[in-house]
Amino acid sequence: IALDAHGLAHVRAGSALDAFRAQGWNAARDRLWQIDLWRKRGLGRLAEDFGPGYLAQDRAARLLLYRGEMGPEWAAYAPDAEAICEAFTQGINAYVAGIEAGDLPLPREFELMGTRPARWAAEDVVRIRSHALVKNAVSELVRARLLREAGPEADALRQPLEPPVARPAPEAAPDLPLEAVDALRLGTAGVAFPPERLAAALE
């Protein structure tokens, strides 16, 4: 892995899988706090590191988490998808191992929060990607209800489509209870660290 004058990484590898290992290592070097937080948020494991103030978000995240069997899931992807994810996460884990051995520095964010980066499994990549598939779920529910109740003109005022597309009103927009919408919103939210949340205790 060579860095150019702009700090951009250029990977040279003897095989495609080695390139993915190098990319995992480089991603960990550049963004370990970010990807570690993505993993913990996606798997519903924030409270393990940050305390009971994150239990509600963990519960909501686990509602959206893919929990199916991995064999059929891998079989639905390209033939080399599992090997690619294995190689990529091996690269991440190699960087984490370097930190654990004292050979690489622990990113400052972990020091400030008193946490440590976790090891990845290949299936983590698949399980947390389900969150990306529902990221706009709340917006889609709002759009469907607005189309049904007030028509496309009202929805265009809320958020115009780019490019403009005529959207017929759905015959039956989901009439979810507010608790379900709140869970969707919380389960797809980013992670914030207000002091009162970090100081929360179990009731």
Give the location of each predicted region.
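Substrate-recognition/specificity elements adjacent to catalytic centers across diverse enzyme folds
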Residues: 2-203
